[in-house]
Amino acid sequence: FKKKSSLPNFFELYQKNVLILGFGRIGKEVAKRCKGFDANIYVYDPFVENKDIESNGCIPINKEEGLHLADYITVHLPLNTKTKNFISNKEFSLMKKTSIIVNSARGGIINEKALIEALKENIVLAAGVDVFEKEPPDQHNPLFKLPNVLLSPHNAALTLECRKRMATEAAQSIVNYLTDKNKINFSNLVNIKELNLQI
């Protein structure tokens, strides 16, 4: 066979350290999938007890330690005053130069300017971005020109199956609210104030 020297670099999850930021429903689903690849799964979520993280086969860790240890960082936090710019210059400085960060949660959790700088300066290896601080993003957004970022237009949840599931869950939540409020999980609601719900 002719030797080919320009093979692309692919990376495995096998025995790699994955840091999940946010361990709600989506974070837990990500953990399940990472387990299938035999990854070491670390979780940072100050609102989830360590025993709950451990019972899902994951290792609880503080934010700084997790960022320093992780090969892959995946963000699954809600956007609020506490999580805005949750990842910025300081956090990028803690990461491995070989780390890959993925945000499919909300734009603004990762400071976009800091992300662009980290990618340009090879502070981190690469990023996957499904969400932006401004949506739709400006056509001149520097992320579009970087070779080490994979972008998608906030469509990570737009599979046919996912849309059907969301519609079914929304309808079931309405039924539960009208018939028996004890059946609905209010902890997942992000707009309780706007809905003026009496809980």
Task: Report residues per predicted region.
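Gly/Ala-rich phosphate-binding loop of Rossmann-like dinucleotide-binding domains
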Residues: 31, 35, 119-120
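Short beta-strand "acidic-cap" motif of Rossmann-like dinucleotide-binding folds
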Residues: 41-43
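Rossmann-like dinucleotide-binding domain for NAD(H)/NADP(H)
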Residues: 98-199
